[in-house]
Amino acid sequence: MFNLHVARQFIFSAAVNCVEMVLIVGYLSQWPVIMTLVVFALYVMRFRFMSQGPLFLLGSMGVVCQSTMLNFMSYPTSNWHTLMFSNMEACVMAVALSALLHYLIPDVEPRKPPPRIEKDAARIRHESLLSGTVATIIFVVFQICDLSDSLSALMAGILILFPMHYRGAVISSIWRVVGVVLACLYILVVQLIIYDFSNHMILMMPLIGLGLAFSARLHVMEKVGAGVGFASITTIGIMFGQNLHPYQDLVFSDLYRITSVTVSLVVTLTLVFLMHRLLNCFAATRFVVSD
């Protein structure tokens, strides 16, 4: 069944995010400290939405769009209008296609909502502060360094924060690595099959669709959110969307992507562990994962 509540969160988050990015990058970029504090506040607010539950998609969409757009808009060669229009266009198309497919291929039986996790105030504060702080550090690193070709590394660091606690981040990072490796191996196979005919869309689309279909099925069967299938979907999308051009060497891109994602995950997990230990020193932000 098509969920209007989810669809509204999806589109509203994209629209609000575009306005925020214009204000942050357009007006606050000349004051880096103030800009960083505003970004931190937005991250904490969005991870708090995710931790509380009902507005999870609003928060998660905001985190992903904020991280991606802040990275691209920091480069002078980026066209803001194209970036924001593409963001809104993609969100509207995703909702419209989802509604269409729900109508054409309805569920056989009603879906049961996942059980809601009861969280105390200390756990919510722990999760929002931990994830918000680490996401802000990632933002600062990508603002200082020239990492415009490391979108997968950026997304890997952000997406493993979605469990919002240390143990969940460790498990998520393992799934992420496996998904990235599987997708990169598939892309290498496509490179061998297509060779230098990648500019022929009629040859590429069936292979891209096959890879996405397999990854989507794996994602649905896992039932764990951002697992192996989800990591594979995002990797295929990024690789084919950004790097598949005529005579582009996807072998180097594959190896670079695996290396950059691994480094990003190790650094992010280290930061998550340190923040987890620090926040657990205070009763107001203490969270101990129970077995």
Language-model segment annotations:
Residues 1-57, 71-208, 215-291:
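Alpha-helical transmembrane segments and their membrane-interface boundaries
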